[in-house]
Amino acid sequence: MKKILSVLLAISLAATLFCACSKSDSSNDTPQTADFSLKYTYDTVYYDYDSSIFHAYEEVCKAVINRESDVRVNTGYFNKVQQLLYTSFPLNALVQKYSVKDDDSGISISYNYEQAEHVEKVNSFNKKILEIEKACNISTASKEEYVINVYHYISSHIKQSKNVAINSFDTVLKGEGSSFSYANVFEYLLLQNDIDAYHIIGADASDVSWGLSAAALDNKVYYFDPMTEFLNNGGKSLYYFGMTDADLKSEGIKSVKFSNNGVPSPVNDKRFAACRKCEKWEIKNRYLLVTVNGGKIVKIALK
């Protein structure tokens, strides 16, 4: 009798272990999914694209986030969709290649990382952007206060990278960048808060390129150079915030263009002129208080 009980106990134990192993194996086989809560944004210079192009763009973005190998989109739009992906979607850095299917039914996507690592990187990016938004008081600041907060955060928290080709995705996660990736991250954070932002390619007299941003504040466009702010004062000031065409020229930028090679309209509003002489600044009661040379405080109303 004891022998029979022992055999039954052994069988029961083996069955329990088998079930446990089966459950464990099953969970390991379940594909990991990304936790992405950010908006699908795009450089404002492309605002006049047809809505069907933006729809296709969002479908590809979703596919990239979930590491899907195929996505059905109208391939006739794909050149413009790619332009949006390369200029406006930081997670495009996870993609190795896009290929139009032979039957034109959509595109195939290959990736730089396997599923688990891909998901980890998507989640890390999403988490970091949310952290930056929180640090910049996105939920309580006015739009213009938020722009100042983001500019200060970027210019004081991101270091210069030795890799001039670094992308905005790596800049967010590594905390280092080039003038172009600095500008891209600045623009991305503004667009997340529904603030019109444009990527700007500047050039000096020797035709050396430099990344800048433009953004609309109270329906007027201004230029921003967060990397030069970092290089010249560690991001402590606002010297290069809210600049005009004349300000750019005084800094050695002789020409500017959008990412689509279009030429911006004249930028000449001097609302933030006091920032060119900024010694220190603070935001108080919906005002930007700029202390200029000599200790005078200039008040700029914020909306």
Question: Where are the model-predicted features located?
Answer:
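Positively charged n-region of N-terminal signal peptides that target proteins for export
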Residues: 1-4
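C-terminal motif of bacterial Sec signal peptides marking the signal peptidase cleavage site
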Residues: 17-20
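Linear, non-domain "peripheral" regions
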Residues: 25-128, 195, 290, 296-303
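Secondary-structure boundary elements
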Residues: 114-172
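Active-site nucleophilic cysteine motif
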Residues: 146, 150, 174-190
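Hydrophobic/aromatic-rich core segments of domains that either
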Residues: 181-252
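Short, mixed charged/polar active-site loops
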Residues: 221-223, 295-298
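Short beta-strand elements that form the blades of beta-propeller/WD-repeat-like
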Residues: 280-282, 287-292
